A protein has these predicted regions:
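Bacterial N-terminal signal peptides
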Residues: 5-15
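Sec/Tat signal peptide C-region and signal peptidase I cleavage site
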Residues: 16-20
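Von Willebrand factor
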Residues: 22-89, 93, 98-145, 174-184, ...
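Second-shell loop/turn segments in exported
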Residues: 31-41, 73, 89, 105-116, ...
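Exposed acidic/Ser/Thr-rich ligand/metal-binding surfaces
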Residues: 116-166, 244
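VWA/integrin I-like adhesion module and closely mimicked acidic/polar interface patches used
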Residues: 149-197
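C-terminal "exit" segments of structured domains
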Residues: 210-244
């Protein structure tokens, strides 16, 4: 894994060989928990929430107000340490049409896994995607979304630290499960709460944050707020960039 960190860090300063990388305001990897603690109805609400967020007026306006007016997004699903899938590779979103195309592909994709929860594996895949993206951006972000702690794969703090060394910020969206079954209680409601677990073990980097959502039905609203915050942090508004 550490060679991906080196590859990503060096690619930021060595790149321009055969052709110039495409410029965007932000490269964003969505890393989504699809482990067994999330049932099919909750999974559908997650997917619909992502679609609603990316096609919302607020998010599209935030994208278009950036210096370049475009972001690059990919989407990863994870469960156990060997259950990681890049569902959608890099897609550039710059307007309503490209946002809708991304949302349609996301909603249409079938669920990948049902295993345990290796947040570290999801982060590792996201670091790899960032290293190989081919985009040039002032900010690189991984969004981790889940309802439980890391209980498979390598230590999540190691994966987080490798991402931070590569210059990547990790943000989190902690989904609170208020009605866990007995065998998942410690997993979804760790001491101090899941948002605090994310802050201490998962997220990090400049302007990183954790957003908590208490209901899968409000996932889309939370994701919209999250995306607007991330996009706004990534770029200087065009009006300022154009000023003498």
């Amino acid at each position: 894994m550490r060679w991906f960190v080196w590859l990503f860090a060096t690619s930021l300063v060595l790149a321009p060989a055969a052709h110039a990388a495409e410029g965007v305001d932000l490269t964003l990897v969505l890393v989504t928990d699809v482990s067994r603690s999330i049932d099919d109805s909750e999974f559908k609400l997650e997917k619909d929430g992502y679609a609603a967020a990316f096609t919302s007026k607020q998010v599209i306006e935030a994208i278009q107000n950036g210096t370049i007016g475009a972001i690059a997004v990919s989407y990863v699903e994870f469960a156990s340490s060997f259950e990681v899938r890049t569902v959608l590779d890099w897609i550039v979103i710059r307007d309503e049409a490209s946002a809708q195309a991304f949302a349609d592909k996301l909603v249409a994709a079938p669920r990948s896994f049902w295993g345990r929860t290796a947040i570290s594996a999801g982060i590792d895949r996201a670091v790899q995607l960032q290293a190989e993206s081919g985009f040039e951006a002032p900010r690189h972000v991984i969004d981790v979304c889940g309802d439980g702690t890391n209980n498979a794969g390598r230590d999540v703090t190691e994966a987080r630290d490798d991402a931070l060394k590569a210059g990547i910020t990790i943000n989190g969206l902690a989904i609170i499960n208020d009605h866990p079954v007995s065998w998942t209680y410690a997993h979804v409601q760790p001491p101090g709460g899941l948002p605090n677990y994310y802050r201490e073990n998962v997220t990090g980097g400049p302007s990183s944050f954790v957003l908590e959502v208490h209901d899968f039905h409000t996932f889309g609203e939370a994701m919209t707020r999250k995306l607007v915050t991330e996009i706004a942090a990534a770029a200087v508004p065009r009006s300022l960039a154009a000023a003498p």
